[in-house]
């Protein structure tokens, strides 16, 4: 169903968005930025907060020395300690609520915008399903982990790299142990058989990836060429899959490619469904369903949609009006014009983030962004049709959607890592353990829902696809997502090497990850490649043992 966006609703949305932007800009201009706030804050140690025992003294410490550099747009520590001295529970509740919203933003942006742009680009470039499956669509499926890893390594607070490392390792452990384990237990009565060649290939490549990462951690440093070599292992994996499918008739490779396509269409954030997609349609369509007062169920559904629409409007509106979308079922000319107009304005705001808003340089950047936005909006309005998306010059539209969806994903991941780091200081928990658990679980819960649903409802083929996806995803996250982060960080330090502090506990997590792979290998081969309860229970025990050990170590450090 195409979008028939009403002009009145479009006007309301535009005015609302402009009011929000105006309030933000007004806040910047009416509160001059101290130049000291723009200087790096790494010369002080934020961990000194633990020596203060009340909110008032912590707030005074933050204001006097300002020791905690936040990667995000908000200073969460000052927000809590300086505004909720008398209501600490309320402040902590608001931070956890914001954490859930950030997970929603990251997952929803990746699935609805980023993946959509990648799929459209693969069609426009006439990529074969083989190449598209292991490149663009893998990038879409692994987007949350990719951006979280990039932010951890490339952000201003370089000390958060352990968050990125633990997130990738924790997510890989969760998917290969918990997700595969639950699938195996759920299918133990069906005695589903897994394709041998594909399983061996994925296990071998994953073990090679884990071994390479362990060597990097043990050595403690890596240069640009070493990081590039680590990342290029994923290119070797892609080439192996493609060649196996093209020349060897490898059905396992074909199943893996199909799994990536299915995951690309099924993988969605946990907060997205139950009406959110329909609410977003209601935002752009400007339609309200006429309900019969005598039909309680229909009236309940209407009000449910309305409440969810109102709650999600502040989250969805900025993205709707800054990310170009040109798909057949979501086309709206007013929204398209608005998105290409506001997108440069948003980019100019991000470019000026660390500048003093009233400076001459910031004003020039804002002026350039506004002029480019007006020009693009005029061109879009003059060259597009009201009812159908553009057929010519489609690449610039898709490239714009890709860039802006990537921008929003990076913003969400940046805030997520910044908030988790702050929560670590607030509760005295290492940010790395939060990356290993909270961030890894949040990014991987979609894999659990998607793969389990596929395995239960799509027969033996669905089970094969689900299990293959449980190994293909972590391979991508380890080699490409983590690899490209290392490449970017090493490039900044080139020709010097970047130092990665050796974390024995991270090596322990890698050891448990290998133990899970070995257990799966031994049980499957002894059971003629059939999934079963023994395999699933063993994987869950391994994961719980790994998690329990890390938690006990963290509690011991706290005392």
Swiss-Prot record:
The record's annotation in PANTHER family points to: CATION_CALCIUM EXCHANGER 2 (PTHR12266:SF18), NA+/CA2+ K+ INDEPENDENT EXCHANGER (PTHR12266)
Q: Which UniProt keywords apply?
A: Antiport, Ion transport, Membrane, Potassium, Potassium transport, Sodium, Sodium transport, Transmembrane, Transmembrane helix, Transport
Q: How does it sit in the membrane?
A: Multi-pass membrane protein
Query: InterPro entries given for it?
Result: CaCA_antiporter, NaCa_Exmemb, NCX_ion-bd_dom_sf
Cell location: Membrane
Positions of transmembrane segments: 10-30, 86-106, 131-151, 167-187, 203-223, 224-244, 331-351, 362-382, 393-413, 416-436, 480-500, 506-526, 531-551
The UniProt function text for this chain reads: Membrane-localized H(+)-dependent K(+) and Na(+) transporter.
Q: Which GO terms describe its cellular component?
A: endoplasmic reticulum; membrane
| Highest taxon of source | Eukaryota
Q: What is this protein called?
A: Cation/calcium exchanger 2
Pfam families assigned to the protein according to its UniProt record, in alphabetical order: Na_Ca_ex
Q: Which GO terms describe its biological process?
A: potassium ion transport; response to osmotic stress; sodium ion transport
Q: Which organism is it from?
A: Arabidopsis thaliana
Similarity comment: Belongs to the Ca(2+):cation antiporter (CaCA) (TC 2.A.19) family. Cation/calcium exchanger (CCX) subfamily.
One GO MF term attached to the UniProt entry: antiporter activity
